[in-house]
Amino acid sequence: AVHAFPPFLVYTKTFLEYVDAVNERGAGVVQIKVKGGPEAIKMFEQPKAVRDGVVDMVHTPGSFYGAEVPEIDAMVASKNDAATTRTNGGTAMMDAAHQKRFNVKYLAWIDSGVGFNIFTVNEPKFRSADGVLDLGGVKIRDNPIYTAFLKSLEATTSPMPSTEAYGALEKGVIDAVPWTSIGITDLKWDKFVKYMVQPSFYSTDLGIIVNLDRWNAMSPEAKKVLQDVAIEWEVKSAADRAADTADYMKAYADGGMKFVSHSAKGEANYLALAYDSVWARLTGRMEEKGSSGDVAKLRALYAPN
């Protein structure tokens, strides 16, 4: 197995705890050997590696391969957490899409329910017309999860892996970063970013995926251990991250970060741009795959309100 992010990041720790739990419970049945993170296989190349059987398991944001499995954007735009979609059939639909389109078993959506915020070096400005964050002239780090939204905010985007963002902030190549509400201090980006723009948007789309040929070759006992622990981790990790949020917010405030809010009108427009851009991208990609009939189903399971 490999993981997208460095081991010190909270999300990687969740995955490594999952591995430990599987190895304990799966003694004599199934064991996971972790080969490393982005230093072993570059983070954006990991999904292809598990699809092609170079590795058996990857812990990664779904957005890194969202062009191939457009259903992933339903997790990004989700108003539900993993336990809910596991129960209502959303996860089964996500798994079927992964098996059909990407030759992987979708084992778990972990750390669900954590939102994203935009963090800036300089004091943020707001557009007078609609009250939305004005990113005109702002150089912002991009990755696939945010692209559509940042374009709608007219930002100047620089796609780069998170491992390069510290250096880019230090050199002034970028002066803003979107990231999950938690974890900025783990990455040490708080040395540069001093403003956190509210509200948060989206949900993390971190999943554990397994090469389908490898999965199909496993014994029923091995599959059961992997899946049972994964389902437990969906519930546990969501609760753990919700508890973490207050701790991180306190750490940000103690470090001098300022929290900047939209006006009521601006917030409504900001969130509409965020979510409309994701559903538009999902719809367009699903049409290209001949699956536009599934868009309404995904919306009902992941974002019913």
Say what each PLM segment does.
Residues A1-T84, Y106-N305:
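N-terminal secretory/targeting leader peptides
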Residues D81-R101:
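A gly/proline- and charged-residue-enriched helix-loop-helix capping module
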